Every structure is written in structure tokens, then in C-alpha cells.
Amino acid sequence: RQMFSVFCPGVKFKTANDLVHGEGYWEMVLRVSKASSLKRMRRALSIMGRDEVDGDKDMSKFFYPAMQATDIYALNADLALGGMDQRHAHMLARDAADKLKLPKPVALHTPLLGSLSGPGRMDTDAKMSKSDPTGTLLIHDSKKKLTKKLSKAYCPPEREGNPVLDIWQYLLEPALGNIIIERPEKFGGNLTFDSYEKLESAYLSGSLHPLDLKNGTAAALYQIIKPMQESCESNPKNYTSLLSAIK
């Protein structure tokens, strides 16, 4: 919370624990379930990293999509924001809202960042996840660790399925604007790009070396997360709790 508040001061947090103990929560879970079908719930299991077969092993998994839809109603959310892997839950919430005469939330989905291990950005099985420590970037990673992880990242000489270019297109360029790739003078000196498209073009043409791209990515990422790390480190107790929670 402390890290997030660096960029969003004044934000209010609601945890799942706050919601599930609220009045009428579980009644709404049952109402959403009744407004849907077993087939629809089975399709939505992918939102929790499961496939449709997993539902046959454990009945409780079928409650999760209905709970996620109920969360949206409990928050009185006008907008449901999530990765593309959450679209089944959001569509369930929209469809059930019609049947239950509830306000219909707008669903906004962001692209998934691909695992550094490669490939594919839109494949939920290959998305960046903390369950794969070498394939993901964490908010508490030092600059040295970011550089090490990215140095081993899958970075093919094309755009499709390139997780390093994904990071620039969907995260770094929108946050930083002007793009600077630092290079030693003996290798041509620093490169500056005023748009992601020009960075991509330079990489695909071969004028930007993969290692330079990776090192520049690590430096830019650290520029963004450093203020959050410094804020959290100013409260050692919170920082220790963060590290233990994400291991």
C-alpha cells in the first residue's frame, strides 16, 4: 500500500476480506450463480490460472468467477479494470447485471506482459507471473537484479512475442515519454527516441543491439520503481512485510 501510494496519494484500499464479510455478499454470489450456467462458469476458470478440467476436481473453484463478479457489484464499480485474462469474469459480471437488474459495469482490459522466458504476450500460460521468479520483474528488485533478469530475457529479432519490447510499449514509453538508451561512446554513444515506434524500428533494423535494449530497459524500470522502494525502505517494518509477502 505504501509503495502504491507514492504514485496514487489518497487512494482508498478495499481488500477481499473487507468484501466477503459484508452484508449480503454471499447472497449475491448465489444470485450471480443462478443467473449463469455451469458451462459459463467453467469457461471463466481461466481467470484464476486454471483450465476447464480443474473444475471437475474441486467444486469450490466454480464459486470464484461468481465471487469476482460480486466483488464488482460490492464495490459499486463503474469500471472493471484488469488484464485480458480477466475478461471472462468481467463479461460474466456484465451479463449477470442485466438479469439481476444491476448497473452494468464497463470492462477495460490491458494487454498481458509476456514472461521474460518467452513467448507469447496474449497466452495466459506465458504471462509474467511471480510464480516464475526468473521470468518476472518484481517491484522490490534492485537495479542489479533487474539487469541480470533482463540480460537473460527472451528477445527475438522480431516484434511478435517479444517481452522486452512489450515492456517499452505498454509500460515505459507511456510513463517516461522520451526514451534514452545509454551506450558507451565506443559503441556509438546514447540513443534517444521520441516514440516507441522509433525504438521498435531501430531494434528490428538491427541498429539497436539486444543487450543495449535490455540494459536500457533495466535502467528505465529502476527509474520508475526507485521512488517506491525508497518510500518503503523508510519504514523497515513495512519493507520486511513486503518482502515476506511476495516470496
Residue ranges and their predicted role:
Residues 1-109:
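Divalent-metal (Mg2+/Mn2+/Ca2+)-assisted nucleotide/phosphate chemistry catalytic cores
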Residues 69, 87-247:
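Conserved nucleotide- and phosphate/pyrophosphate-binding catalytic cores
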